[in-house]
Each structure stands twice: as structure tokens, then as C-alpha cells.
């Protein structure tokens, strides 16, 4: 009996297994461009999915980016989207090319070098795992009351850059990682973006808070009150406010009242909360305001606009899907740095992000909008609504531009956007919350902080001009409706090219658990 076909089949299986092993080993090396978790060799260089997609798009449209500084911008997980020119130059300098060799065609010298780097990374991880870990549980925490928070990616690495003085956002040493405990298990891509995976203990305690320069009012168990803040919302209320804040659709006076069991906070503590939210916002801004203002004179030419209009519908949808997904990842990082957010149960973290992340992106968009000529910053320059004609959803684009125009008329400061977007995200009226009271407490604290800041800066009048929450929900619904139409026309494009996080948040097509847990 001829066993040649059997041997050939066995060899093929072994080759496939070897390739999978090589890929998994390569992924221990961080992205050479930005330092994020890599996903393999792309265009000749070990990169993450984000840098792979960025390079692919830049080559597809022969993009000509420009740098507003000295063409030496640092490129890391936090700043990689701030300067496309320097990011592309780093890609090219490190050898990314459409003509780059495949992994299987590497020379022996290249393979040996790669193997040595893999071994180095594995040794570093092994050393970290062997380091002793001292963990102090919170006072009074017992058994199931001890909360653990899962941060999502292998070895606790987050998708975006971390600041060393923000423990909740820092990468967890492997020694802190252990299997998830009790509670719901999430395997979706939103969790992968920073809320699930190997769990990292981030229990809060008063002692830990003091050591980190924070006070106990950061927890959801502590409430700020108008009396302790020296605020009287009845006195400061704008004449046109009426009963704003008493329902789920406005941002007037605080929506919830303090509870007897919740400790009060002082004016100093409210000031600290304002500063904490604003700091978290500054560290997770996709683009710096000064850069956006400097670029306002850099407008797409008529020829460039025509080029965008001639693109296929699916290509423009893919581009916008990737840009929106990147913006959402920054919102995820912002949420994790918000005081009290990581103390919510995991289900409620997911619910708030799935419902509010795009709403936060829409509010942040007003920073990139120029009301003088009704243009928005997109892929390095400013352009009007006509730039997005190929999407085939002019009504949605017009609604988004109108919303940005209305917000820009309020002349928000960066701190006001920080506090406003925190309230957009932390909304106790979202359906599906399991511990609604905790979210109410956190929302109440943030509302007091927002009102305190507006009173301090004599800007209370903007409360009457803020768009109702229903407006943001309407824009998000329009987006989902247009996506459903596009998905019906181009299902393969959505399945094959759209980011997993985008598909999970918006697509109506349910993916298999296997696909979600990759």
C-alpha cells in the first residue's frame, strides 16, 4: 500500500503546526513601531494590528503626510495617532515594505536573530513571574467581596500607552496575573480592548490610595455633596434650566442624591476629582488641541476631495471603521483611568463602554471641527462633508457635522470636555446594569465635580445649552442603521476587513465564540 499521501498529509500538518508555533513565539516581541502587543510579521517587520493597518492604508492611497513639528515625534502606543508622517517614516525606517520577504523566506541569519530576540523576551517574562508579589487586600474585604479586575490582553498589556502614576492603567507584571475568579466571563473584543483576559488584582484600599496620592472619595462608595462643596445648585441654576437634571436626558443639577451610608467629601476632595478626570482626559486624547488648531489652514484641495469621492463605498467604510475603532480604544483607556470606574463590576464596565464609547467620540470630535468653514480633521487635513460622499450616508454625516457645530459654539475648554465626556460615559440609566446604585454614586460625584468646575469658572450658563442625551443616542442609532444597510450590501467586506472591536460593537451579525476569543 502506497503511504506517500499519508506522509504528505502528516508533513502538511506538521508544517502548519510549526508555523503556528513560530507565530505565537513572535508575538512575545512587542510591536517595533509603537511597542504595543504584536500580532506577527507584517510587511517584513514585527508589528501590531494597528500599525499593520496604518501602513497598508498609507500604501494603498500613496498618502503624503506632513509633520507640524520637527519631524521627530515620538511614536508609542499613546502618541502613534498624533503624527501620521513620523509614524510612516518610522515604519519605513524599520524596513516595512510591500515587497518585504515572508517569514518562511528569511535567511538563516535573520531567523537566528529573531529566535534570539524571542528567547530574550521569554526570559524576561520568566524573571518577572518569579518576582515576589506583595498584595494588600482592602480593609474589610472578605471572600467574594474582594474585587478583581481583568485588564484584557496577554500579560496585562493594555492597547494604549500607560502613565506610571496611574496604577489602574499600568501594565500588570505577569506575577500578578491569575485565572479569573467568580463573576461573569467575557470573551469579546471589547473586553480584549482592556477589560478582560488574565485578571489583575487592583483592589482599592485607603492605605493604597494614600500611597498613590489619592483619597478615599475616589471610590464609588464615597459621595460628594453640594453641602460639603459649598455649592447650592438652586442658587446657581440658570433661569432657563427649570428641572434639568431630574431625569435621564439632561445635565442640569445632580440627578441623584447622597445616601446615609455614603461618606461625604470636602471641597478639596472635589477639586482633586476634577483634577483627576482632567488628567485622565489629557493622557488619553488622540490628538492634541494645539496640533489641531495649527493644522486648520491645511485643507484638502479640490483634487484631493475628488480622490476621496472616487473611492469605493467599501474602502471609505473600512477607513472610517478603523479610525472610529482607534478613537474608541482611547475612550476605553480614558474610562479605565476615571476614578471609580474600575471599582464597578465587570458587567457594568462593559455595558457603559458599549453604550457610551461612541457618544464620547462624537463629543471629542468637536475639538477637531472648524466652525469657520465647517470642516473636520481627517487623515492629516481638514475637509468638509463632501469628503465623505462615497460612504453613501449624507444624512448621517450632515447630522454629525451639525452636532459638532452646535458643540463648538459653546467654546468648550479642555477641562470642560473632560468632565462632560466623563458624564456622557458614566450614565446610570443605561439598560443592563447589574449594580445601578454604584453607577449612580459615581455619576453623582462626577456631576458635582462638573458643576463645581463650571461655578468656579463662571460658566454655569452652558448647562442650559448642552444637547440632550437623546441627541447622542439618535446619532448612534443612525450610524448603526447605515452600517446595517452597508453590511447587507457588502457582508464579506465587513467580515474580512472591519476591526473585530468595531464589528462587535455595531454589527448585527453574531460571531462565534471561537472568533471572539482569539
UniProtKB/Swiss-Prot annotation:
Domain comment, as recorded: The AF-2 (activation function-2) motif is required for recruiting coregulators containing LXXLL motifs such as NCOA1 and NCOA2.
Family, per entry: Belongs to the nuclear hormone receptor family. NR1 subfamily.
Subunit structure of this chain's protein: Interacts (via AF-2 motif) with the coactivators NCOA1, NCOA2 and PPARGC1A (via LXXLL motif). Interacts with the corepressor NCOR1. Interacts with CRY1. Interacts (via AF-2 motif) with PROX1. Interacts with FOXP3. Interacts with NR0B2.
GO cellular component: nucleoplasm; nucleus
Location of this chain's protein in the cell: Nucleus
Gene Ontology molecular-function annotations: DNA-binding transcription factor activity; nuclear receptor activity; oxysterol binding; RNA polymerase II cis-regulatory region sequence-specific DNA binding; zinc ion binding
ZnF (NR C4-type) intervals: 31-51, 67-91
Gene3D superfamilies attached to this UniProt entry: Erythroid Transcription Factor GATA-1, subunit A, Retinoid X Receptor
UniProt-listed InterPro entries: NHR-like_dom_sf (IPR035500), NR_DBD_ROR (IPR044101), Nucl_hrmn_rcpt_lig-bd (IPR000536), Nuclear_hrmn_rcpt (IPR001723), ROR_rcpt (IPR003079), Znf_hrmn_rcpt (IPR001628), Znf_NHR/GATA (IPR013088)
Ranges spanned by the short sequence motif AF-2, renumbered to the chain: 501-506
Function: Nuclear receptor that binds DNA as a monomer to ROR response elements (RORE) containing a single core motif half-site 5'-AGGTCA-3' preceded by a short A-T-rich sequence. Key regulator of cellular differentiation, immunity, peripheral circadian rhythm as well as lipid, steroid, xenobiotics and glucose metabolism. Considered to have intrinsic transcriptional activity, have some natural ligands like oxysterols that act as agonists (25-hydroxycholesterol) or inverse agonists (7-oxygenated sterols), enhancing or repressing the transcriptional activity, respectively.
This protein's record includes keyword Protein biosynthesis: no
Keywords per UniProt: Activator, Biological rhythms, Developmental protein, DNA-binding, Metal-binding, Nucleus, Receptor, Transcription, Transcription regulation, Zinc, Zinc-finger
Species of the source: Pongo abelii
Residue spans binding DNA: 31-96
Low complexity compositional bias, start-end: 119-130
Top-rank taxon, per record: Eukaryota
Biased amino acid composition, Basic and acidic residues: 109-118
Domain NR LBD: start-end pairs: 269-508
GO terms, biological process: adipose tissue development; circadian regulation of gene expression; lymph node development; Peyer's patch development; positive regulation of circadian rhythm; positive regulation of DNA-templated transcription; regulation of fat cell differentiation; regulation of glucose metabolic process
Pfam families: Hormone_recep, zf-C4
Name of this protein: Nuclear receptor ROR-gamma
Record bears the keyword NAD: no
Amino acid at each position: 500500500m502506497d503511504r506517500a499521501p499519508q506522509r504528505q498529509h502528516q508533513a502538511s500538518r506538521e508544517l502548519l503546526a510549526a508555523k503556528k508555533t513560530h507565530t505565537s513565539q513572535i508575538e512575545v516581541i512587542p510591536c517595533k513601531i509603537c511597542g504595543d502587543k504584536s500580532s506577527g510579521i507584517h510587511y517584513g517587520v514585527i508589528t501590531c494590528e494597528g500599525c499593520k493597518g496604518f501602513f497598508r492604508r498609507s500604501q494603498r492611497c500613496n498618502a503624503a503626510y506632513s509633520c507640524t513639528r520637527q519631524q521627530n515625534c515620538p511614536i508609542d502606543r499613546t502618541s502613534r495617532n498624533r503624527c501620521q508622517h513620523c509614524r510612516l517614516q518610522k515604519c519605513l525606517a524599520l524596513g516595512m515594505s510591500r515587497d518585504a520577504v515572508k517569514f518562511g523566506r528569511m535567511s538563516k541569519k535573520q531567523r537566528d536573530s529573531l529566535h534570539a530576540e524571542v528567547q530574550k523576551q521569554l526570559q524576561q517574562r520568566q524573571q518577572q513571574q518569579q518576582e515576589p508579589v506583595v498584595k494588600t487586600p482592602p480593609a474589610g474585604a472578605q471572600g467574594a467581596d474582594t474585587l478583581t479586575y481583568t485588564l484584557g490582553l496577554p500579560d496585562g498589556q493594555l492597547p494604549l500607552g500607560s502613565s506610571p502614576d496611574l496604577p489602574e492603567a499600568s501594565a500588570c507584571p505577569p506575577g500578578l496575573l491569575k485565572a479569573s475568579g467568580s463573576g461573569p466571563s467575557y470573551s469579546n473584543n471589547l473586553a480584549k480592548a482592556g477589560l478582560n483576559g488574565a485578571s489583575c488584582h487592583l483592589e482599592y484600599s485607603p492605605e493604597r490610595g494614600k500611597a498613590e496620592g489619592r483619597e478615599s472619595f475616589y471610590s464609588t462608595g464615597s459621595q460628594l455633596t453640594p453641602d460639603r462643596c459649598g455649592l447650592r445648585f438652586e442658587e446657581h441654576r440658570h433661569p432657563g434650566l427649570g428641572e434639568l437634571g431630574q431625569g435621564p436626558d439632561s445635565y442640569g443639577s445632580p440627578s441623584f442624591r447622597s445616601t446615609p451610608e455614603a461618606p461625604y467629601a470636602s471641597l478639596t476632595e472635589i477639586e482633586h476629582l476634577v483634577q483627576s478626570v482632567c488628567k485622565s482626559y489629557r493622557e488619553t486624547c488622540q490628538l492634541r488641541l494645539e496640533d489641531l488648531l495649527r493644522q486648520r489652514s491645511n485643507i484638502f484641495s479640490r483634487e484631493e476631495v475628488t480622490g476621496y469621492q472616487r473611492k469605493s463605498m467599501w474602502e471609505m467604510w473600512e477607513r472610517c471603521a478603523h479610525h472610529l475603532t482607534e478613537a474608541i480604544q482611547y475612550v476605553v483607556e480614558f474610562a479605565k483611568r476615571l476614578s471609580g470606574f474600575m471599582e464597578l463590576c465587570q458587567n457594568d464596565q462593559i455595558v457603559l463602554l458599549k453604550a457610551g464609547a461612541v457618544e464620547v467620540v462624537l463629543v471629542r470630535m468637536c475639538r477637531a471641527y472648524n466652525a469657520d468653514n465647517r470642516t473636520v480633521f481627517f487623515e492629516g487635513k481638514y475637509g468638509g462633508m463632501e469628503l465623505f460622499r462615497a460612504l453613501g450616508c449624507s444624512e448621517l454625516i450632515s447630522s454629525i457635522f451639525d452636532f459638532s457645530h452646535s458643540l463648538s459654539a459653546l467654546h468648550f475648554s479642555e477641562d470642560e470636555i473632560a468632565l462632560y465626556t466623563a458624564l456622557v460615559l458614566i450614565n446610570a440609566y443605561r439598560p443592563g446594569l447589574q449594580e445601578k446604585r454604584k453607577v449612580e454614586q459615581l455619576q453623582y460625584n462626577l456631576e458635582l465635580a462638573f458643576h463645581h468646575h463650571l461655578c468656579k469658572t463662571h460658566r454655569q450658563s452652558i448647562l442650559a445649552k448642552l444637547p440632550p442625551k437623546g441627541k447622542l443616542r439618535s446619532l448612534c442609532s443612525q450610524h448603526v442603521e447605515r452600517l446595517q444597510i452597508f453590511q447587507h450590501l457588502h457582508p464579506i467586506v465587513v467580515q474580512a476587513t472591519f476591526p473585530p472591536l468595531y464589528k462587535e460593537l455595531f454589527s448585527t451579525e453574531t460571531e462565534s465564540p471561537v472568533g471572539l476569543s482569539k
